[in-house]
Design a protein with these regions (language model features):
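Intrinsically disordered, low-complexity non-transmembrane regions of multi-pass membrane transporters
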Residues: 1, 195-219
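C-terminal ends of transmembrane helices
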Residues: 18-28, 51, 75-88, 133-143, ...
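Cytoplasmic-side transmembrane-helix entry/capping segments in multi-pass membrane proteins
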Residues: 33-41, 63-68, 88-99, 121-123, ...
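Ordered, amphipathic secondary-structure segments that act as subunit-interaction surfaces
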Residues: 72-109
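Helix-coil boundary and interhelical linker segments in multi-pass alpha-helical membrane proteins
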Residues: 1-5, 51-61, 106-119, 164-175
């Protein structure tokens, strides 16, 4: 693999996403092999789904560096695990960076395949978010993308910024950096100020609301 700017982004995204997956696996007391599998699925899951939808060979089947980078991520967690645990928001940091980088990778690869930009934004979102969905399923958690946090929408915002910069004919590197920073900034602002999308009300909440209305009417 030639070390171009997009390939560096992809490698860094693989490393950070793998660390986020392995970090959660360690919290669930997985063994080394299980942690490696979770880290690998986190790192390559979104890109694999993207490549299947784009009808191309999965990227990790063309180069073993992604398997190697995941092994490096496992080694880093094993060696520096105590420091990572002590560091506040370890998972959030690595997950957010990986999300931002993979959104850029997904958009860039889709554009290179001559798909329209709205498809590129969808593929960027899938590349960034789908690996995390698979990770959460493997560790028996509700996927982060389906909780209140703004996650997938951060990918969409990053994609829109990418499109705007692309239309304004910005340099490719600047476009990719600005799109990634948009994803990171959106996630940070959403978490800091507890911003979230509206939730659908469940049956229990509806019943509680109806009971409350009845009590109010009696009074």
């Amino acid at each position: 693999m030639a070390l171009t700017f997009p390939s560096i982004i992809e490698i860094l995204g693989t490393l950070t996403f793998a660390i986020s997956g392995i970090r959660l696996a360690s919290a669930k007391r997985f063994d080394w092999f299980g942690a490696y599998v979770v880290g690998l699925i986190t790192a390559i899951g979104g890109g694999t789904i993207r490549d299947l939808l784009l009808d191309t060979t999965a990227f990790w089947m063309l180069n073993s560096i992604y398997l190697t980078v995941t092994a490096v991520a496992l080694l880093l967690v094993i060696i520096f695990g105590r420091y990572l645990i002590r560091l506040n928001n370890t998972f959030f940091i690595f997950d957010t960076i990986g999300l931002a980088l993979f959104v850029v990778v997904g958009i860039q690869k889709t554009i290179a395949a001559d798909f329209p930009f709205w498809i590129a934004i969808i593929m960027g979102t899938i590349t960034g978010a789908a690996g995390g969905v698979l990770r959460d399923i493997l560790i028996n958690e509700v996927p982060l993308i389906f909780r209140k946090e703004i996650y997938a929408m951060a990918c969409v915002f990053g994609g829109i910024v990418y499109w705007i910069c692309y239309r304004l004919d910005y340099a490719p590197h600047l476009t990719q950096v600005l799109a990634a920073l948009t994803v990171i900034a959106t996630r940070i602002v959403a978490v800091k100020y507890k911003l979230s999308l509206p939730r659908l009300r469940g049956d229990e909440e509806v019943e509680e609301s109806e009971n409350s209305d009845r009590e109010d009417s009696r009074q």
